[in-house]
Amino acid sequence: RPDILAAISKGEHSSTFGGNPISCAAGIAALTSITEDGLIENSKKMGEMFRQGLEKLKDKHTMIRDIRGKGLMIGIEMKFEVKDILMGLIQEGVLMLYSGRNILRILPPLVIKEEDVTKVLHALDIVITKEEEKRDV
C-alpha cells in the first residue's frame, strides 16, 4: 500500500541478514565448515548414540515416559516435573533445558563428541536414579 510505503524513506530501514560482503563471507565459512568438518555425519552418529543410550535408560527407569526427536534434537518426556532433575544435572556438570514442565530437552552443538554423550547419559542415570529413590518409584 502506498501509505505504508511512504512511511519510511530510502535507507531508513536495513536488514541484519542483508547480503553485505561480511555476512556473505560468514555464511560461506559456516556452510564450508558444516560440510568439510563432517558436522552432518557427526550429528547423525551422535544422535544415534544418544538414542540408543536413552532407550536403555528408559528400560531401566520407570520415570521416563518417552524418547523422541531426530538427530541431536531430542526430548525426554518424564512422568513428573523435571525441575529437580535439571538441578541434579547441574550438580553432575551437565546443563540441560526443559520444554514444558515434564520434558528434558537435549540440543547439543553439532561438534559434540562421544565422551560428551557418554557423560550426559551417565549423569542422567545418576540423577534419575536419585529422583526415583526420593519419590519411591
Ranges and model annotations:
Residues 1-137:
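Conserved N-terminal phosphate-binding loop of PLP-dependent enzymes in the Aspartate aminotransferase
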